[in-house]
């Protein structure tokens, strides 16, 4: 390390973001933006799931009748499961469509801003209907399902675009987006508990709580949109997001001819800083991801089936060869072969599907079937799951605690041991709520730990060499996750309806 670089490091060490592993404020702001985007993906779903009593009794508030009795108990007793099924069904269809050439040709910014805007309509509808009231409970059912379908569309747009944006970034940024998914869930659960404790449980109190609760959700969406707007002008983000980099070049009037986007071959080049010959690498910490990039040997470009399991090296030290000048993100993705990417990462895609399938298979539906006398049972179950998920994703911020792809496979099937135990609780063979509380925390912990890493290993594998491939890999991970959630929630619906 030279005297000059040591002096720079010494002057930066006092900065708060440097102590957290970020070398510049722009880098830290990029990380925060991805956390907010992750939060926005799950914001409405987390808000609805964290207020199970409000949803299952929505017909009371929507009709304005405190004494109303459910006319369709089959739906209202399983309202959360119906909501999840509708949301995930719509989401998986939209996410699959996002891989088509037509959808990939639409700029990421346009799709993402649309996805961030839809939740405003969802939350306003949820709040406005009880304020205006509707005459029938069937109308309340329609509101729940319309909000679910809109939520699925919004989540798909936000999820696929966020994955495409974060895929080329170093691993810690994708972990930040994944962390945001659980931060919002835990945050909304805590807010719901605070509101329930601090306010009453009368008809009017619940309406007031819902307005405060969902109003907070609207505020979070505003923050995410503002952060995304600023991200377009962030020099660190422009280094990895081709669309933002090309826009910056156009603003400066530096538009250079680029290859036609019809080209099937990835562009080559390097806009990220690489070390000069003979220069030693300088890292902030031995365990921290390096921001510098490295070229890869030519013999590593063979697309082998399941290569993610045998991959060696560190993707964060590799150069993405299509990060060139004014190429856009859509051009990068159109040049990537979806099938070639799928072949290399399919073991992690299967893990993502299995983990989230089993999660939605028993949570929240089957856990809610446990005979419990406490009116707090459902709220505590949701909070404990979110807490376990949150803790797991925090642990993954520490590099040495991240499991390898092979360990992810072991964890994926090991967590299935929770299912027979919760079935025994539902059937009454194991009485009380103590064991369900322990099981749901462990289920959330393994969901966050192995589920997150299965998604991270998809784009952040050394077997991929282009930013377009990493974006597609991250989108495939999102689709596998959504397929698991969709099939799991629908299977859970079938179980709870026949119980």
Curated annotation (Swiss-Prot):
Mutating residue 393 to K: effect? Slightly reduces inosine and guanosine transport. Moderately reduces sensitivity to formycin B. No significant effects on protein localization to cell membrane
**Origin: domain of life:** Eukaryota
Name the glycosylated positions: 326
Look up what happens after changing residue 189 to A.
No significant effect on inosine and guanosine transport. Slightly reduces affinity for inosine and guanosine. No significant effects on sensitivity to formycin B. No significant effects on protein localization to cell membrane
State the similarity comment: Belongs to the SLC29A/ENT transporter (TC 2.A.57) family.
Keyword set includes Transmembrane: yes
The protein's topology relative to the membrane is: Multi-pass membrane protein
Residue ranges for the region (Disordered) are 255-276
Q: Where would one find the signal peptide in this protein?
A: none
Record flagged with keyword Plastid: no
List the ranges whose topology is Cytoplasmic.
1-30
**Spans traversing the lipid bilayer:** 31-51, 112-132, 133-153, 179-199, 212-232, 350-370, 378-398, 406-426, 428-448, 475-495
Can you say what this protein is called?
Nucleoside transporter 2
Cited InterPro entries? Eqnu_transpt, MFS_trans_sf
The subcellular location is:
Cell membrane; Cell projection, Cilium, Flagellum
One Gene Ontology cellular component term attached to this UniProt record is:
plasma membrane
The UniProt-reported impact of residue 389 to E is:
Reduces transport of inosine and guanosine. Moderately reduces sensitivity to formycin B. No significant effects on protein localization to cell membrane
Miscellaneous comment? Can transport formycin B, a toxic inosine analog, but not tubercidin, a toxic adenosine analog.
Q: Disruption effect?
A: Gene knockout results in a reduced ability of parasites to transport inosine. Increased adenosine transport. Increased resistance to formycin B, a toxic inosine analog. No proliferation of promastigotes in medium with xanthosine as the sole purine nutrient. Abolished xanthosine transport. No significant effects on the transformation of promastigotes to axenic and intracellular amastigotes. No significant effects on the ability of parasites to infect and maintain an infection in mouse cells.
């Amino acid at each position: 390390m030279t005297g000059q670089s040591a002096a720079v490091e010494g002057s930066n060490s006092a900065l708060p973001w440097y102590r957290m592993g970020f070398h510049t404020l722009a880098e830290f702001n990029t990380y925060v933006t991805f956390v907010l985007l992750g939060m926005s993906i799950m914001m409405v779903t987390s808000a609805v799931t964290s207020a199970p009593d409000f949803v299952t009794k929505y017909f009371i508030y929507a009709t304005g009748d405190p004494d109303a009795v459910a006319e369709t108990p089959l739906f209202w007793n399983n309202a959360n499961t119906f909501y999840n099924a509708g949301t995930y069904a719509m989401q998986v269809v939209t996410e699959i469509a996002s891989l088509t050439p037509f959808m990939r040709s639409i700029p990421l910014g346009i799709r993402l801003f649309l996805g961030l805007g839809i939740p405003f309509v969802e939350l306003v509808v949820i709040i406005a209907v009880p304020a205006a009231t509707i005459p029938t409970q069937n109308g309340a059912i329609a509101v729940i399902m319309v909000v679910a379908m809109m939520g699925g569309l919004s989540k798909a747009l936000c999820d696929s675009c966020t994955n495409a944006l974060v895929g080329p970034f170093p691993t810690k940024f994708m972990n930040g987006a994944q962390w945001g998914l659980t931060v919002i869930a835990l945050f909304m659960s805590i807010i719901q508990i605070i509101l329930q404790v601090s306010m009453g449980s009368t008809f009017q109190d619940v309406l007031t709580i819902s307005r405060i609760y969902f109003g907070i959700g609207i505020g979070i969406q505003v923050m995410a949109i503002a952060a995304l707007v600023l991200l377009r002008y962030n020099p660190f983000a422009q280094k990895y997001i081709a669309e933002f980099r090309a826009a910056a070049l156009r603003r400066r009037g530096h538009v250079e001819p680029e290859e036609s986007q019809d080209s099937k071959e990835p562009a080559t080049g390097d806009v990220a800083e690489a070390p000069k010959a003979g220069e030693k690498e300088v890292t902030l910490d031995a365990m921290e991801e390096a921001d510098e990039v490295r070229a890869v040997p030519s013999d590593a470009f063979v697309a082998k089936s399941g290569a993610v399991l045998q991959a060696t090296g560190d993707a964060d030290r590799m150069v993405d060869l299509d990060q060139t000048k004014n190429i856009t993100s859509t051009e990068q993705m159109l040049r990537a072969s979806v099938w070639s990417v799928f072949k290399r990462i399919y073991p992690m895609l299967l893990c993502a599907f299995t983990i989230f399938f089993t999660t939605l298979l028993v949570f929240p539906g089957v856990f809610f079937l446990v005979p419990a006398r406490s009116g707090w049972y459902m709220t505590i179950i949701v909070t404990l799951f979110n807490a376990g998920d949150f803790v797991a994703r925090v642990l993954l911020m520490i590099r040495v605690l991240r499991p390898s792809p092979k360990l992810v496979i072991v964890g994926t099937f090991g967590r299935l041991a929770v299912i027979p135990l919760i079935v025994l609780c539902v059937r009454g063979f194991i009485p009380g709520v103590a064991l369900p509380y322990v099981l749901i925390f462990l289920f959330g912990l393994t969901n966050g730990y192995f589920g997150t890493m299965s998604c991270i290993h998809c784009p952040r594998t050394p077997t991929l060499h282009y930013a377009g491939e990493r974006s597609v890999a991250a989108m495939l991970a999102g689709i596998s996750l959504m397929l698991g959630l969709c099939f799991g929630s629908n299977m859970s619906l079938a179980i709870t309806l026949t119980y």
